[in-house]
């Protein structure tokens, strides 16, 4: 069921993922390219109540949708435990758009972020 959030993540269209991921960002020295690694531990998308194939991760906010198809499952003792998704940006405008989503997602979920120095 879809919650009424400003920003959300979906693996199945119309179904919000309630598990909040750990997100790690890396950028090139000139800042024009980089990636965001999303790590979900025991996400609902891997539970027995979900049906269908995961074909990507949708990041949805008031501006629209950002889609990545780079999604993989990690198994522990034969059980799907982790879901990892990678969003790659290749321009500063893509990065700026991603950061607007990330800030909106953080506010929707009561989160903050920290930077490594």
Swiss-Prot record:
This protein's GO CC annotations: photosystem II oxygen evolving complex; plasma membrane-derived thylakoid membrane
Family: Belongs to the Psb28 family.
Keyword DNA repair assigned: no
Protein name in the entry: Photosystem II reaction center Psb28 protein
Topology in the lipid bilayer: Peripheral membrane protein
Keywords, sorted A to Z: Membrane, Photosynthesis, Photosystem II, Thylakoid
Subunit architecture: Part of the photosystem II complex.
Subcellular localization(s) per the UniProt record: Cellular thylakoid membrane
Top-rank taxon, per record: Bacteria
PANTHER family per UniProt: PHOTOSYSTEM II REACTION CENTER PSB28 PROTEIN, CHLOROPLASTIC, PTHR34963
Gene designation: psb28
Pfam families, per the entry: Psb28
UniProt cross-references to InterPro entries, sorted A to Z: Psb28_c1_sf (IPR038676), PSII_Psb28_class-1 (IPR005610)
Biological processes annotated in GO: photosynthesis
């Amino acid at each position: 069921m879809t919650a009424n959030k400003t920003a959300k993540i979906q693996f199945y269209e119309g179904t919000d993922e309630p598990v909040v991921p750990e997100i790690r960002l890396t950028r090139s020295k000139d800042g024009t390219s980089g990636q965001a690694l999303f790590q979900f531990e025991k996400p609902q998308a891997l539970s027995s109540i979900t049906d269908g194939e995961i074909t990507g991760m949708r990041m949805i906010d008031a501006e629209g949708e950002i889609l990545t198809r780079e999604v993989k499952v990690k198994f522990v003792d034969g059980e799907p435990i982790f879901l990892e998704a990678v969003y790659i940006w290749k321009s500063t405008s893509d990065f700026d758009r991603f950061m607007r989503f990330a800030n909106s997602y953080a506010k929707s979920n009561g989160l903050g972020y920290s930077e490594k120095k």
